[in-house]
């Protein structure tokens, strides 16, 4: 009889988990930030609130977001007017939309990732899906697996309501699955649609106005696996390490509550400072085995959050100008797409590296960090190793 140790060795991959493909998608409806206040106050029947509209216009300008993609259109909102109210119970209307639309948008991103990966989708062994919205049974993971035609034997995991750090969290889980199940190929998908948080304006709720000004809709997918097949699978990054930390006594720093009116969000006005003051400890612990302590020596795949958070991180860590340029670019072109955003940044980093003739997928550097932060306050840190570019 074989030993348990031999059985366990046979189940584990030989090499580290790698990211083999990335795909992204957005709804077709593009909204320019300069004209969004007019749209928002018109569809919510709030054009008579002149002072509040001017305030919202200033908020939109300060985000430094240029444009966003959103599922909601004026036609949809006319059909479901409760969504335009500030406090009217409207959860059922919102839920009817997201349960159907989240898997559809996710499918677009997943198909792009699978196409780049280059192997049949029947070879996908695990599906990890995350979203802040669309809680249902069976969940969005089941619906996506059905839409894609994945094998009935695919191992599914659904993650709900984790918010902005969930993209990095999902990568940590995918790493463990790939390295502990030999031959596993993990399709990890994130999809965020802001239908549950869209609502009319109120003069006394700055946080709600900030959400209307900064959040966007998008989906992203990656294929993760270890021991890539030579000549078939072409890794983009190796996942060297992944960890999570919770900042003590920070529960009220940022969070959300699911109510009859949809999602309501709150955030501490010193959130940028809180993140900046705690990120270096996470970085130090993650990179200690590599002997790296100079943060300009690594490439950055960062969840942007907002402009103020990126400014605070740059200042605290002494980052060179341009270290977070890709995160800033993605934020300005798409807004904050919560868990999906960090994958848009990853996709942009590897594409820019190739376009600029860099030596590696990490802007010419070997080691990099992917990080996200969210309610808790939770910080996810992932150590990436780039691969050489031809």
Curated annotation (Swiss-Prot):
Q: How does activity depend on pH?
A: Optimum pH is 8.0.
Q: How does activity depend on temperature?
A: Optimum temperature is 45-55 degrees Celsius.
Q: What is its EC number?
A: 2.3.1.217, 2.3.1.219
Which branch of life, at top level? Eukaryota
Annotated pathway: Secondary metabolite biosynthesis; flavonoid biosynthesis
Q: Which reaction does it catalyse?
A: (E)-feruloylacetyl-CoA + (E)-feruloyl-CoA + H2O = curcumin + CO2 + 2 CoA; (E)-feruloylacetyl-CoA + (E)-4-coumaroyl-CoA + H2O = demethoxycurcumin + CO2 + 2 CoA; (4-coumaroyl)acetyl-CoA + 4-coumaroyl-CoA + H2O = bisdemethoxycurcumin + CO2 + 2 CoA
The job of this chain, per UniProt, is described as: Catalyzes the synthesis of curcumin by condensing feruloyl-CoA with a diketide-CoA in the curcuminoid biosynthesis. Also acts as a demethoxycurcumin synthase by accepting 4-coumaroyl-CoA as a starter substrate instead of feruloyl-CoA.
Summarize the subunit comment.
Answer: Homodimer.
Name this polypeptide is given: Curcumin synthase 3
* Originating species: Curcuma longa
What lineage does UniProt assign to this protein's organism?
Eukaryota, Viridiplantae, Streptophyta, Embryophyta, Tracheophyta
Gene from which the chain derives: CURS3
């Amino acid at each position: 009889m074989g030993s348990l140790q031999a059985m366990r060795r046979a189940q584990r991959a030989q090499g580290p988990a790698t990211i083999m493909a990335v795909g992204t998608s957005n709804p077709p409806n593009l909204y320019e930030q300069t004209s969004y206040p007019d749209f928002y106050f018109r569809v919510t029947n709030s054009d008579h609130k002149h002072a509040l509209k001017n305030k919202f216009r200033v908020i939109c300008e300060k985000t430094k977001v240029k444009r966003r993609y959103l599922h909601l259109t004026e036609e949809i909102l006319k059909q479901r007017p409760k969504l335009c109210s500030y406090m009217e119970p409207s959860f059922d209307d919102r839920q009817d939309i997201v349960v159907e639309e989240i898997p559809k948008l996710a499918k677009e991103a997943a198909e792009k990732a699978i196409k780049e990966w280059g192997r049949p989708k029947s070879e996908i062994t695990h599906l990890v899906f995350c979203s802040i919205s669309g809680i249902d049974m069976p969940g969005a993971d089941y619906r996506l697996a059905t839409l894609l035609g994945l094998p009935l034997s695919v191992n599914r995991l659904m993650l709900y309501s984790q918010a902005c750090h969930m993209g990095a969290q999902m990568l940590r889980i995918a790493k463990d699955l790939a390295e502990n199940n030999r031959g596993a190929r993990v399709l990890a998908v994130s999809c965020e649609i802001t239908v549950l948080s869209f609502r009319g304006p109120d003069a006394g709720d700055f946080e709600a106005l900030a959400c209307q000004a900064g959040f966007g809709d998008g989906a992203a997918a990656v294929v993760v696996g270890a021991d890539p097949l030579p000549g078939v699978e072409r890794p983009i990054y190796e996942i060297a390490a992944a960890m999570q930390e919770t900042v003590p006594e920070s529960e009220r720093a940022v969070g959300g509550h699911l109510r009859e009116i949809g999602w309501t969000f709150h955030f501490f006005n010193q959130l940028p400072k809180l993140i900046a003051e705690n990120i270096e400890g996470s970085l130090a612990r993650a990179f200690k085995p590599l002997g790296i302590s100079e943060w300009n020596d690594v490439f950055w795949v960062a969840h942007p959050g907002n402009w103020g958070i990126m400014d605070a991180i740059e200042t605290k860590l002494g980052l060179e100008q341009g270290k977070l340029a890709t995160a800033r670019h993605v934020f300005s072109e798409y807004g904050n797409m919560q868990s999906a955003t960090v994958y848009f940044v990853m996709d942009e980093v590897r594409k820019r590296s190739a376009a600029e003739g860099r030596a590696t997928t990490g802007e010419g550097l070997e080691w990099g960090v992917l990080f996200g932060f969210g309610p808790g306050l939770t910080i996810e840190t992932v150590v990436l190793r780039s691969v050489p570019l031809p």
